[in-house]
C-alpha cells in the first residue's frame, strides 16, 4: 500500500502546475538510469524552437562509452545558430551517468547524472547534478529527472536552478 501511495504521488506531481520563472531552456532529453556493460554511443540531437520572429537552432554531437559496468561518460560538442544566422561552436560538455541500482533490484531503478559545461569563447561555466528515476509497471514506465544546476562566470550572473523532467511511456507491443 505504501508503494502504491508513493507511485501515485509521483504521477500526480507530474500533472501539477505552478507559476515558474524559466530562462528559456527547452527540454530535449529525459534520461533513463540504465548503463550497459561495454556500451558505446554516438549521438546527434537537433533542437529547434520558435523565439519571437526567428527560430532557434542547436545541434549536439556526442560520443560516449561505459567505463565501468555501471558508469558511462559522454563528451558533447554543441553548435548553435547566432543572431546573424551563422552556425558555430557554442559549448563543450562532459556528462557522466551512474547506475545506482540494478534493473529490477528494488521497487524502482535509480541513477545519478553529473555534467560539466563550458560556453565557447565566454567565461560561463555550468555544473549539473541530478537524480534519475524509472519505474516500470506492466507495459508502462515512468521516468523522472530532478536536476540541480549551478551557473557561474564573469559573463553571467551566478545562479542556482532546479529542473524537472518527466516521461510516461506505454509500450504497445
Language-model segments: which ranges?
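Sec-dependent signal peptide recognition
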Residues: 2-10
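Short linear sequence elements within intrinsically disordered, low-complexity coil regions
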Residues: 10-11, 39
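N-terminal signal peptide c-region/cleavage motif recognized by signal peptidases
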Residues: 17-18
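Transmembrane beta-barrel domains of Gram-negative outer membranes and organellar outer membranes
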Residues: 21-173
Amino acid at each position: 500500500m505504501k508503494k502504491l501511495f508513493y507511485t501515485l504521488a509521483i504521477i500526480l506531481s507530474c500533472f501539477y502546475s505552478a507559476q515558474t520563472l524559466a530562462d528559456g531552456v527547452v527540454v530535449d532529453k529525459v534520461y533513463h538510469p540504465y548503463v550497459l556493460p561495454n556500451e558505446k554511443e554516438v549521438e546527434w540531437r537537433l533542437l529547434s524552437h520558435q523565439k519571437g520572429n526567428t527560430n532557434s537552432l542547436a545541434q549536439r554531437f556526442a560520443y560516449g562509452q561505459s567505463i565501468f559496468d555501471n558508469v558511462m561518460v559522454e563528451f558533447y560538442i554543441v553548435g548553435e545558430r547566432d543572431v546573424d544566422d551563422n552556425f558555430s561552436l557554442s559549448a563543450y560538455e562532459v556528462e557522466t551517468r551512474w547506475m545506482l541500482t540494478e534493473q529490477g533490484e528494488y521497487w524502482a531503478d535509480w541513477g545519478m547524472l553529473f555534467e560539466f559545461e563550458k560556453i565557447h569563447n565566454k567565461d560561463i561555466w555550468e555544473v549539473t547534478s541530478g537524480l534519475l528515476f524509472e519505474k516500470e509497471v506492466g507495459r508502462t514506465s515512468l521516468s523522472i529527472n530532478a536536476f540541480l544546476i549551478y551557473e557561474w562566470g564573469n559573463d553571467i550572473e551566478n545562479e542556482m536552478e532546479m529542473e524537472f523532467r518527466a516521461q510516461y511511456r506505454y509500450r504497445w507491443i
